Amino acid sequence: MEKGYLALILHAHLPFVRHPEYKEFLEERWFFEALTETYIPLLSLFERLVNDKIEFYLTLSLSPTLLSMLNDTLLKERYINYLNKMIELCEKEIERTRFSPSFHKLALMYYYRFSKTKDKFLNQYNQDLIKEFKKYQDKGYLEIITCAATHGFLPLLLHKEAIKAQIEAGVSFYSKIFSTSPSGLWLPECGYFEGLDKFLKECGIKYFILETHGVLFARPRPKFGVYSSYYTKNRVAVFGRDPETSKSVWSSIEGYPGDYNYREYFRDIGFDLDYDYIKPYISPCGARIFTGIKYYKITGPTPYKEPYVPEKAREKAAEHAGNFMFNREKQIEYLYSVLGRKPIVVAPYDAELFGHWWFEGIDWLEFLIRKIKYDQNIFKLTTPSLYLKLYPKNQLINPAPSSWGWKGYYEVWLNGSNDWIYPHLHRAQETMINLAKRFKNVNGEKRRVLNQMVRELFLAQASDWAFMMKTGSFSEYAKKRVVTHLERFYLLKQFLEKDFINYEVLEDIENKDNIFPDLDYSLFHS
């Protein structure tokens, strides 16, 4: 009989990036890379496990923005073009490296990976990854949960109408896609403030996940630390993140991804090779970018790098999976002995860590699931919903304000680099609330304008933009996105004020920002 449980929770999210006004757009590659390196490999992993009759229980958060992109015809077409381009580059690399055995072997590996990915996407999945994820949920292996509509950082949205609208739109979109209601909701950036659980309860959410101190600093003090479920005063269950599992996988210094045998993310032929040779495969503006073809392993902390050896990296992934499992065995045995109940170790990660940032992460995950099944009997994999069925009665707590960002609170999304956006967002939210009251029961074209205004506001609220401004990565693009969506928001507002709609402009905006086709402005009714 098992003594406890491990809940692996993967949060799959990307901001909504879709630019039909351009033939090719650099930032759309974020989606293409994640498809190639994370989402399709995850589905392949699930397929292998099911074929081998290995039961597994994982929780997967699919954000509404990601689901929208997975469902978008234009992005699917562009993804196929991207794969064709990468296959062509791999063919050139096979020829270029023919006298360099170490690199030639890797060029062949990448050619095979891109070709296989294209075949799966087109022929096996019929370009419909959502259907594939749903299949594993229907079989009981996956618990798919939702997120706020555009990943808005809820503690900084200020207005209760704006907060509830983000949550309600995310839940509604999930229900439309999966024909069922989500049991859980991933709070964007795990951002929590006192009273947020009320909105979750109103939208039918059964549980959410917080950073460690969000539970540990709760009032009253949680009896079982982060190793149990709890209920908020509004009877929504909350789970806390385990710090040990976090450090061992997240940290590039102390954790597994920093092992010297693993692939070096930052050495890429997009930067290493002759400019004229690589130019057709980099940014349309001519800037060097990552292609995903990387020939070196981490090797050490110096610029010197040695060729990547996939076999050794895979051996390390198996070794690290075994180490992770051993540590969970000892951890859960101890917790079981002192808590008097079966503990749950909650291990949430960004899904894109596996395969994209940590190339061997998918292999590690597969080794771990297989080892848990065959190499031990101390704990089992579970999901938050399954654990709540086992322990339906739980202590009542009031979680602490928190996030999983740097320093654990709100500073990443509110600092000198991005604080300028909030007066504008809050003003737009007030405008939307007032317009929803003023035009309470309109139909036809005015309703169409109001619905598009909500789309623009949602897209401006995405937490990704403030995060990029803080890190300095793609910060100019992030600033432009916030400004552009707010400009479109106020342009649409003018149509209502002047009682004159420019249909050409409206259709252009609807075509560019076509997220959530069934969105209704009544979400902002008080």
Identify the residue ranges that each predicted region occupies.
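Acidic (Asp/Glu)-rich catalytic clusters
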Residues: 2, 47-55, 128-145, 164, ...
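Active-site and substrate-binding clefts of carbohydrate-active enzymes
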Residues: 2-55, 62-105, 220-526
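Short, solvent-exposed turn/loop segments enriched in Gly/Ser/Thr/Pro and often Arg
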Residues: 61-66, 148, 184-193, 213, ...
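Glycine-rich phosphate-binding "P-loop"
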Residues: 146-169
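His/Asp/Glu-enriched short active-site or ligand-binding loop at hydrolase and phosphoryl-transfer sites
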Residues: 153, 205-218, 381-383
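CE4/NodB-like, metal-dependent polysaccharide N-deacetylase domain
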Residues: 163-187, 327-339, 343-348
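Conserved short loop/turn motifs at secondary-structure junctions
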Residues: 182-192, 350-354, 474
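Hydrophobic, small-residue-rich alpha-helical packing segments that form membrane-like cores
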Residues: 191, 196-205, 221
